[in-house]
């Protein structure tokens, strides 16, 4: 089956690009599908986009804010004659593009839905969701919370709920001792990692406000924050100073390479996701891929990805107090973290890219056939 896949791909930054690249590879390997990436060159104008630009291959032609590139993509699809178009969707601003592609090619389309509702909603979102519904012949979701939204918003569209596969580490991992030495962390202190893009809904502020209560319990605990800040990092630096956390919080703003991410996870005892809202998060899967448990808030699909006491801990709520209590549970369990590894390994096997590709491929075949 020939699949045209519209999405960001590496070397663009972000979890969507990484997810789509791994899915394309798994579809080729497990099913021998001919997956043709139709890759974005840019998603936002330079004055909005933040972060360093990586050189992109010439075939990365699609520009979300340039309708002329949409027309070129339509022409490419007409030449490719794929059996199905698979599109990655995580923000409403993609809906007009996908609507135009579906209408002017006539090729059936499956939406790989990371999020239906944006984390930071805006007034035209209902209109954009209607455009998406008019474009989709089928929908793939990664969590039950998103599936429920889809069933309510577009009940007539075929839906397959799958899962977010685990990200396996690339290359060898540094030892805990070496990683902590390089990051200037105490070899025996508890270390938590907040990893990935820093945006308001991800709750770093909440985690920082939980830290004073946590430090009353364990004064040596360190919080490592690594990722690209979509907000002013100086706000967080001032908050760290205001709360007296300078000796317990390390901020590493900016793009994190694969090698550097392995260093952070190797140094950490657990990853913390203090999200205020969420659907699912690739950070959980990345932590499991590195053999680390997680501490999450009870929002969106995050609790679905945690087996309490076996692969991590779920806070009672998304408040500083709730997070402090969950970290307390982690501290109580720290001596037996090694015993959690078999459960994390089992999760990795169950949530593999191979299993995802087999199920997704069968669904794509069904939609392509009009069934």
Regions found by a protein language model. Give the residues of each.
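A short helix/loop element that forms part of the nucleotide-sugar donor recognition site in Leloir-type
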Residues: 171-185, 359
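Conserved donor-binding/catalytic core segment of Leloir-type glycosyltransferases
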Residues: 186-202, 208-211, 224
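A short, well-ordered alpha-helix in the C-terminal region of glycosyltransferases
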Residues: 190, 336-350
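Nucleotide-activated donor-binding/catalytic signature segment of Leloir-type glycosyltransferases, i.e.
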Residues: 234-262
């Amino acid at each position: 089956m020939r699949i045209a896949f519209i999405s960001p791909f590496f070397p663009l930054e972000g979890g969507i690009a990484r997810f789509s690249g791994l899915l394309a590879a798994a579809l080729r390997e497990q099913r021998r599908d001919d997956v043709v990436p139709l890759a974005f060159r840019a998603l936002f104008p330079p004055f909005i986009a933040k972060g360093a630009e990586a050189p992109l291959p010439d075939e990365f032609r699609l520009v979300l804010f340039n309708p002329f590139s949409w027309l070129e993509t339509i022409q490419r699809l007409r030449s490719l004659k794929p059996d199905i178009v698979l599109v990655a969707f995580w923000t409403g601003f993609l809906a007009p593009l996908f609507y135009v592609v579906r209408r002017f090619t006539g090729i059936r389309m499956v939406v790989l839905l990371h999020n239906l509702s944006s984390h930071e909603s805006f007034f035209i979102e209902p209109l954009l969701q209607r455009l998406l519904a008019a474009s989709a012949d089928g929908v793939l979701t990664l969590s039950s919370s998103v599936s429920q939204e889809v069933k309510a918003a577009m009940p007539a569209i075929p839906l397959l709920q799958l899962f977010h596969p685990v990200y396996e580490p690339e290359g060898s991992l540094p030892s805990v001792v070496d990683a902590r030495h390089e990051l200037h962390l105490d070899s025996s202190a508890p270390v938590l990692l907040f990893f990935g893009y820093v945006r308001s809904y991800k709750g770093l502020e909440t985690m920082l406000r939980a830290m004073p209560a946590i430090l009353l319990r364990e004064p040596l605990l360190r919080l490592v924050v690594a990722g690209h800040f979509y907000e002013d990092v100086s706000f967080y630096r001032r908050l760290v100073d205001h709360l007296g956390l300078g000796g317990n919080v390390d901020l590493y703003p900016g793009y994190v390479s694969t090698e550097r991410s392995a260093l952070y996870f190797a140094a950490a005892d657990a990853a913390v996701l203090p999200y205020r809202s969420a659907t699912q998060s690739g950070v959980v899967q990345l932590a499991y891929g590195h053999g680390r448990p997680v501490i999450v808030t009870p929002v969106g699909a995050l609790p679905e990805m945690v087996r309490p006491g076996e692969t991590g801990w779920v806070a009672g709520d998304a408040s500083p107090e709730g997070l402090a209590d969950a970290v307390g549970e982690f501290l109580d369990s720290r001596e037996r973290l090694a015993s959690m590894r078999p459960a994390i390994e089992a999760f990795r096997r169950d949530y593999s890219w191979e299993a995802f590709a087999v199920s997704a491929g069968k669904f794509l075949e069904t939609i392509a056939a009009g069934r």
